[in-house]
């Protein structure tokens, strides 16, 4: 994602302030049907997820346990980030009715990552506005799995790439929000993949680490306004970026009527129901120090998508090769890369 595009998107949520950004890769940890936030203790959960981050991810993830202290490795570049981030999984539905998982590909200037996602933490330029880092036990949910229609504002934004080169420079990738960006899955063939950005809320009520719906304790500011009185504490803007490798699925496999063939694992063929989960797991006060220092990709490098370690001396990093070695075996064991007669869990496809 181009730096200027990032600014254009996030200023909407940051009241038109300049911003500072951490951008880093998190390789794949595991892909399986577990969801300790929405379906704690249920093995398997109803639909498939792809998970990145620390290896403390499990079926329950008791909020009283600090996963920043219990995890022993992380798939993320910042070695103190043992948080877990996960989303639904994209599947291709062929004209014969069978399904195949769409793999993820690495992002621009993060080509050594094995699948996974790119994670962003954003803070405003105004250092007099305190940004409160999350606390152990904090978790939240962005998006609604059951959505099949557009809503006011957006949680997800899609971009259709035509191609990419050996350096993972994707095309087209215009500055700002492109006229072709959508809040639903693209309807045309995307030879360079489908990128989806998912944005988490930036305001917290300052009390609850979670709520039964995993949403009520946090809020999005209204059209760039300050945080509302009900949720007065400003927290980092977290958003995650996933690129699905749709190039692998030639148009000869598409439905004969040419209709959009991709569907998310909860049975969503629209993209409006894409959603993401976040469980905080940074070790110690590293994230708070980074937010206080307004660590920034752009300030640290002439190339804004490369983040050298000296860009945030408050945080420890690890090589992507080391990060790629962190993984988990499936707890809910089932095939991942075979052609399937139905979505995992026999999830029905719904349009409303």
Predicted regions and their residues:
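Primary mode marks residue(s) on the alpha4-beta5-alpha5 output face of response regulator receiver
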Residues: 19-45, 50-198, 205-352
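Fungal secretory targeting signals
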Residues: 1-21, 352
């Amino acid at each position: 994602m181009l730096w200027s595009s990032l600014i254009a998107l996030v200023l909407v949520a940051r009241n038109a302030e300049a911003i500072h950004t951490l951008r880093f890769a998190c390789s794949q940890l595991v892909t399986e049907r577990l969801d300790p936030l929405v379906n704690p203790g249920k093995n398997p959960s109803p639909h498939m997820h792809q998970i990145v981050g620390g290896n403390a991810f499990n079926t329950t993830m008791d909020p009283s346990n600090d996963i920043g202290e219990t995890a022993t490795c992380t798939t993320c570049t910042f070695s103190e980030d043992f948080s877990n981030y996960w989303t639904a999984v994209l599947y291709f539905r062929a004209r014969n009715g069978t399904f195949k998982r769409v793999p993820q590909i690495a992002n621009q200037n993060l080509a050594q990552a094995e699948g996974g996602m790119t994670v962003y933490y954003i803070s405003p330029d105004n250092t007099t506005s305190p940004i409160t880092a999350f606390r152990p036990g904090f978790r939240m949910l962005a998006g609604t799995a059951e959505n099949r229609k557009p809503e006011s504002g957006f949680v997800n934004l899609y971009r259709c790439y035509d191609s990419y080169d050996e350096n993972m420079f994707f095309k087209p990738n215009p500055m700002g929000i492109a006229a072709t960006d959508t809040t639903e899955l693209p309807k045309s063939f995307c030879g360079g993949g489908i990128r989806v950005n998912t944005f988490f809320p930036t305001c917290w009520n300052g009390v609850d680490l979670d709520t039964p719906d995993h949403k009520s304790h946090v809020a999005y500011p209204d059209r760039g306004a300050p945080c509302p009185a009900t949720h007065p504490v400003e927290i980092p803007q977290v958003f995650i970026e996933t690129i699905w490798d749709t190039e692998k699925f030639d148009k000869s496999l598409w439905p004969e009527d040419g209709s959009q063939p991709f569907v998310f694992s909860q049975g969503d063929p629209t993209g409006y129901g894409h959603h993401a989960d976040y469980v905080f797991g940074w070790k110690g006060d590293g994230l708070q120090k980074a937010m206080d220092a307004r660590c920034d990709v752009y300030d640290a490098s002439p190339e804004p998508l490369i983040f050298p370690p000296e860009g945030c001396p408050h945080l420890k990093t690890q090589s992507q090769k080391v990060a790629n070695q962190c993984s988990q075996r499936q707890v809910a064991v089932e095939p991942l890369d075979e052609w399937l007669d139905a979505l995992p869990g026999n999830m029905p496809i719904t349009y409303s």
